[in-house]
Amino acid sequence: TATEYASASTVYLRTHRPDSTSLTASYQNGSFGTHKLAATCSYKDWGFVDAAYTRTKGNYPFSYHTQYEDTTGTRRNSDITMFRIEGCAFWKGLQWHTYYFNSVRGLPGGIVRRLSDTYTDVGREWDRNFFSQLTYREEFGRLGLRGIVKYANDYLHYRSDYPENISVHSNNRYHQQDVYGAAAASLRLGRFGLSASTDLRWSDLTTDVKNFHYVYRMDSKTSLSAFYSHNGLNVNLSGLYTHVSDHTYGTTKPMSKMTWNALASYTTGPWTLRTFYKSVFRAPTLNDLYYTLVGNRNLKPEYTKQFDVGVVYKTDGLD
């Protein structure tokens, strides 16, 4: 997709299609009151459901050595409760994947100088993540088609109310939504090939932070790529157009950029000479711009250029 072309580097993960029908369940426990339950049910070629629950009390001991004291303490408010469930269904070229995650965790207070200076353990964090995605992939001779539709919903609640330092008081809730759609097509004509893709993403951010104004973003990307392969020579050229616009109180300037990529390699015998050039444009995310403490509305887009030349030698004489 165009979003994949836009990344400086990409790791491709594809959900495994079950090759057998099975049902498994497990229970584990460990130190510091840790308990874990997990279960997986899969049906050959059709889909699976996987769930896990984890609970730990934390409260683990630790050694503390400074010029003021040498002692052992116990880390309080370090509990974690987590639940995750996800499922995936397959039918011909269609794949539907749904995921849900919920967690509550404590955030231990920091130590200033002495163990007795430990901040009161009041920090807490609540997370909830959900997404549902439908993917279509099919080939018709030399023509390949791919489509993706995805909806994501994320919630974060962070609270820290240290009586020792009221200046770091925080009790914020963030809610983000993301709707994403992508379509891509590829055509192979002998030694030549063409591919085109376009992505459209709508995302928003709401929070109860004082003086925060609702913001949503429209992000579109379009890419066109051509490649040639013959007698050990491989060449790929591509262009990507990105347009990002934020809509909130006041005015924001849209961001647009055209970037280019080129890759070439030549193989003769055990030797391969390869090189590539890639320019990358990345707009700050809504988190980068609008989150409390870590957000900075004055952030500028990132521009990256990558260039690489390498030689590879392969031989069957070495294991």
Task: For the regions a language model picked out, list residue spans one by one.
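N-terminal periplasmic accessory domains that precede
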Residues: 1-27, 37-39
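Periplasmic-side early beta-strands and strand-to-turn transitions of outer-membrane beta-barrels
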Residues: 20, 40, 44-125
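Transmembrane beta-strands of outer-membrane beta-barrel proteins
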Residues: 21-25, 45-51, 87, 92-98, ...
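Transmembrane beta-strands of outer-membrane beta-barrel pores
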Residues: 29-31, 53-57, 91-93, 100-104, ...
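Outer-membrane beta-barrel translocator domains and adjoining extracellular loop/strand segments
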Residues: 38-40, 60-68, 104-116, 148-150, ...
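Residues on the lipid-exposed face of transmembrane beta-strands in outer-membrane beta-barrel proteins
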Residues: 39-43, 85-91, 132-138, 181-187, ...
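Outer-membrane beta-barrel signature, preferentially recognizing the C-terminal barrel domain
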Residues: 120-139, 252-319
